[in-house]
């Protein structure tokens, strides 16, 4: 078609050897006409280089949030093994700054071609990303985005929009005279708290638009103080019997649900986040009305695949990949799965 030899076409395709300008133009014209694109998977299979992707995530236990993230990462790793891509983990304790710093320090000793980070502790993450950028190592974030960095991609949920939706579905249960209670977190200065604040912003935006006169209370729950939480909730519900709508902005809606279960009572509506086993059990029994899912397994899977597309297959990637905002209730939870 181009009127040149097969050897010339091969040299143009693989950008090697000397080719005259006129011959190169002839070959390129035909390539454009047939919309030629190189088979990057074949190139990856043929490549002799081995690639190493390091994933920094919190320690986890079975059936919890980060367990699902790791399952997605493992699935991507299995699919990419034929392309000489290896995936390894560095773990840290979720609320422990020194543990996170240690994982970041160990990374510097790894021969990483790309890094997937579940960021925690903003300053330490910024120091980590400064090192990665200086070393020209691409990195992506999952679960939480730190905008001051130059991450290749963020994969996770739009927290503010999810909060807006949480309010919208919860208020479907509203009847005149009812009051709302927000169950908040006592942890400060970590990404989980910032993520909760963004959800709360979206939640309050909907209420300001549609329910300006709603009476709203808030209670701060403590992760490790079950007895203190129980006394606080006893006093609150005794004083505010009309507070029959509730919202939890982290994954621990089971704390409130367990209290309600022990008391043999249910709210008119209670919304929370994440499909932890404890949360879904209370969804099925009715103490929790709605759960917002953020597909942690898909986050891990897409994080590794995105880095591989960039590093191995040289494909362009989008800077932000938002996860679907899944709304689960007892009627559909048994039919839910992230991906197959």
Map each language-model feature to its residues.
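N-terminal helix-turn-helix DNA-binding module of bacterial transcription factors
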Residues: 1-47
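Hinge/cleft segment of the Venus flytrap/periplasmic-binding protein
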Residues: 30, 34, 191, 207, ...
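Amphipathic helical "hinge" segments at domain boundaries
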Residues: 39-98
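Hinge/beta->alpha junction and helix N-cap segments in small-molecule ligand-binding domains
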Residues: 58-67, 88-98, 121, 156-162, ...
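Short helix-capping segments at alpha-helix termini
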Residues: 79-83, 135, 207-214, 261-267
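Hydrophobic alpha-helical
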Residues: 114-133, 217-278
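Flexible loop/hinge segments that line or gate small-molecule binding clefts
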Residues: 124-161, 276-284
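Hydrophobic alpha-helical segments within soluble ligand-binding/sensing domains
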Residues: 154-181, 229, 295-312
